[in-house]
Each structure stands twice: as C-alpha cells, then as structure tokens.
Amino acid sequence: MKKEKHLKKIISICIFIIVVQGVFLFYSFFFQSKESIYFDGINAIRKNDNYYFAVGSNNDNDKHYEKAKVSVYDEKRDKLFEKLYNVGFNSAYFGACIEDNGLIAVGSYEKTKKDHNALVRRGLIVRYDYDGSIVFSSEFKLLDNTKFTNVISVEDGYYVIGQSIYKSTDFGNEQGGGILVKYDKKGNVDWYKSLGSSKEGIFNDFYLSDDFIYVVGQLNDNVGVLCKYKLDGELIYQKEFDNNIFNSVYLVDDYLYICGSSDSSALLLKLSLEGDIITSSYYDKVSNAKFNRIIYDDSLIVIGSSFNKNYDGIIVKYGMDLEELSAVTYGDDKNDYLTDIIFDDGNYLVVGYSVYEDKNYLSKFIRYSEALKVLGVEK
C-alpha cells in the first residue's frame, strides 16, 4: 500500500509539472504568434477611497504583442482610462501597490528584439501618477530571464519579489531563483537577495510586518519555500516543504497562513512565525486544484482554480483553525481563472479572466457576498 501510494504521488507530481510547463509554453507561443486571438487579463486589483486600479496585460494592437496595462475605474467600476506600457515587445504586470500620490506596478518585459526572439524578459517596476503618466520606470536583470510578481511600498522605497533564472542551458552562476529587491523612491536598487539556483526558484508572494518580511514561493517544481528576512535583507530562516507549492501568505495574530497546492489538492497551512506547521487543510473536492491568493476579514478567504476538462475558479472561506466554512466554484465559461481578491464595501471583489467559445480571453470582475453568493459579474 505504501509503495502504491508513493507511486500515485510521483505520478501526480509529474502530471502537475507537465501541465505547468505546457501552460508556460502556450503562454510564450501565444504572444509570439500573430494570431487574431484577443487577450485581456487582470492579474491584480487594488483600491483606495476613490478608485480601483487593475493591472495585467492585453494584446489589442496590430502586431498582437502582449502589453502591460494599468486600468483605472471609478467607484462604480466604470473605466476612466487605461495605459499600456508601449516599450519593447511583450510585457505584463503581475503585482501592484497604491501610494498617496500614485500607483506602483511590477512585472516583466522584452526590451530588445534579441529578448523577444529568445523569449526572455527583464524585471520591470513602473510608478504612475493618478493621471496615468509614468513618473519612473526601472528594469532589473540578474540572469537572462527575470520577472517581478509583487510589490510593497514602505516609507523609504519599495520591496519587490520575483524570479531571475537562466532560460538557456547556461550554468555556473550561484545567484538566481527567487529574488527579493529593495528599491528607493526613485527606482534605484538599494540591494537584492536571491534564493534557489540559476535554473529554478521563484518568490510568489510576501507579507511585511513591523520588523520582518515573510516570503513564499517554490525552489523547484515540487518544493515550497518559506523565508523570513530582516528589513535589511538578512535571511533569518529558510524552510522547505516537499511536494508543495506556495502562492500566497498572510499574517494574522502571530500566525502565518499560506496557500498553494500539494500534489493535486489545493493546500492551506497555519504556521508559527518560526515556520513550523500547526495545522493543514487540503481542498480535494475538485480535481487538480490550487489556491492562488489569500486575504483576511474575520475569516480566511482563498481563491484558486481546478481543472477537469476545463478550468474553473474556486473560492473558499475558512475559520482561523482552518475549518472550512463555505465553498463555491465559478465556471460560467469554457475556462475561468481567478487571480486576485480584495474586501470591498462589505463584499468580496474577485478579478481574473475567462476564455470563451471564440477562444478570446476577457477580463472580468466578480462580486461575492460574505456568504459567497455571486452578486454580479462585470466584463
């Protein structure tokens, strides 16, 4: 029985790796091709008292290049304007944060024709004012393929996380993998730290407390990682978790909550601040599931996706000891991807994108009640 169970786990991991690599190759090919398939996706949503800010990408141009975008909406979510990052070739934003006088967006872009032909990107951080004008933009390239996944603003600058690896067969560089970069307010690099290898590793999300930075991601295709850093970048600890992938982290009442996946099940963990697991919960009601994002509002809310012929979104509410309170799936269209969630005026606002029968990808807003009832969908 143990041998059979171990074999099933290995098969599940192999299937997951194949799916992930397949998605990456499709993504790269999709935006290099000149097909007329339309793509418009939202990867992150932020809100202040007056506006909603969504970042992502679309390919609404003659050459069908993917272009990083910032979209600004009023309180009724009517779009006021949208700005594309029209530098280089393909680009995308994956994370954002709001400041008193503007927005910071982070992602990646192909700067040169050589980058474009090699399918490699540079990390990108851009500061916008509230009118959508660029205040500064700065690139980061440790190894030949780099992207930023999230950003947090602090008084003296910005913390940014992501990945920098060799896409080619190059070896020999001890740096690379997941990256943590500290910028000043003008977009200059103060310092950076890397963890992993020159071929693997990524930081997907982080949480900033008063004195420490908690970062989650993966070292390779099936090893999740939790790191605790001082604010100056000194590594306090690195904890590795086999057969796991970590996508998001939140800190509540001196406990860390991390979501992601384990084999073919979505995963939620409760840990001490020293990185020791207290309890875990596996969401296996649907096949090939993963959690992408976690937030807190009296309870834990996680969003993610599952795959069984088509991709469906999932949203689950948990108590603080990881007892499941309610769960729903979202599958109105052929494929549905939920990418981010915020608490908004007593409800939950979820963003993402869907693939329709005509093969076009369109972004959407989905508003849920606290009881996880769909109140409205806006495309």
Predicted regions located by residue number:
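A sequence-level/structural motif corresponding to short, flexible coil/turn segments enriched
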Residues: Q21, L25-K379
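Helix-centric, low-specificity signal for extended rod-like, repetitive segments
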Residues: M1-K2, C14, D115, N360
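N-terminal Sec-pathway targeting helices
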Residues: K2-Q21
